């Protein structure tokens, strides 16, 4: 594993902002980056499944679950789907489950916490909308870089 965010900060400090959320690592791939795709949902991961069913080459899904850890928005089945569709990673402002299995998967996964409970499946949620989490904006088509050191956002793809 390679640390990427310190190098990015050293080379591009004026082009990045820190996404200052207390997220934990759950996937085997600890360092990952890509173009941001967003989902906003609450206790319903239908849109997460829809998005992860698409080609995710070079992309990271950022899910705003409103910070709730009552129901998991990502589990092992959706993580497998993400891997099958070439996603770089999934960042969840909410809960995940099946963490023992996901810790063995070659996917970047960060989340606020865990819950053993599954979500509702009502088709609710919004895709590719601007998210605001802890007063910080996350916009689709921006770029996100994540590792053990933190999470950075940039308007452009950075070389490092």
UniProtKB/Swiss-Prot annotation:
Coiled coil: none annotated. Keywords: Lyase, Metal-binding. Catalyzes the aldol cleavage of 4-hydroxy-4-methyl-2-oxoglutarate (HMG) into 2 molecules of pyruvate. Also contains a secondary oxaloacetate (OAA) decarboxylase activity due to the common pyruvate enolate transition state formed following C-C bond cleavage in the retro-aldol and decarboxylation reactions. Its cofactor is a divalent metal cation. GO terms for biological process: regulation of RNA metabolic process. GO terms for molecular function: 4-hydroxy-4-methyl-2-oxoglutarate aldolase activity; metal ion binding; oxaloacetate decarboxylase activity; ribonuclease inhibitor activity. Homotrimer. A divalent metal cation binds at residue 98. Belongs to the class II aldolase/RraA-like family. Divalent metal cation. It is an enzyme of class 4 (lyase). InterPro entries: RraA (IPR010203), RraA/RraA-like (IPR005493), RraA/RraA-like_sf (IPR036704). Its EC number is 4.1.3.17, 4.1.1.112. It catalyses: 4-hydroxy-4-methyl-2-oxoglutarate = 2 pyruvate; oxaloacetate + H(+) = pyruvate + CO2. It comes from Vibrio vulnificus (strain YJ016). It comes from the Bacteria. Substrate binds at residues 75-78, 97. This is Putative 4-hydroxy-4-methyl-2-oxoglutarate aldolase.
